[in-house]
Amino acid sequence: MNRSDVTDLIIEAKVTRGIAWAQVAERVGRSKEWTTAACLGQMAFDAAGARAVMELFGLPPEAEPWLREVPYKGSLPTQVPADPLIYRFYELISVYGTTFKALIHEEFGDGIMSAIDFRMDLQREPDPNGDRVRIEMSGKFLPYKTY
């Protein structure tokens, strides 16, 4: 068993049991965004979170160390994502990445937005022309240091 196998078991149980990510997050005691990332193999659960996920999804005991293992973050099966939804984010960064960089540097100076000290909130935004996806991202600004 490896982390990919555990992710497959989680997805299979989620589908067959009709579990929503928000339900998992409530059981784990974290946001739905962080919990979903952890279930999909991008974050590591603490012991209590791993136990809650194992119980909810009916995972075997050998899944626990994989749920708690620090993952290789940002790993996708291909360099350019093929999934249409994920590709839109890739496209968004390709088009607006330099704009994000310019505006962040103008506002904060030379540095980066942390993806470690980070929060995200995803909501449905009703719109008469078709519902919209609203994603709010908040990352700590980390200035580059001179030495």
From Swiss-Prot:
Keywords from the named record: Lyase
Record-annotated active site: R88, E91, S114
Organism annotation: Cupriavidus necator (strain ATCC 17699 / DSM 428 / KCTC 22496 / NCIMB 10442 / H16 / Stanier 337) (Ralstonia eutropha)
Protein name: Cyanate hydratase
Example of a GO MF term: cyanate hydratase activity
Job description of the protein: Catalyzes the reaction of cyanate with bicarbonate to produce ammonia and carbon dioxide.
Endpoints of the signal sequence: none
EC top class, as a word: lyase
One protein family per Pfam: Cyanate_lyase
Family: Belongs to the cyanase family.
Catalysed reaction, written as an equation: cyanate + hydrogencarbonate + 3 H(+) = NH4(+) + 2 CO2
Alphabetized PANTHER family for the sequence: CYANATE HYDRATASE (PTHR34186:SF2)
EC number in record: 4.2.1.104
GO process annotations (BP): cyanate metabolic process
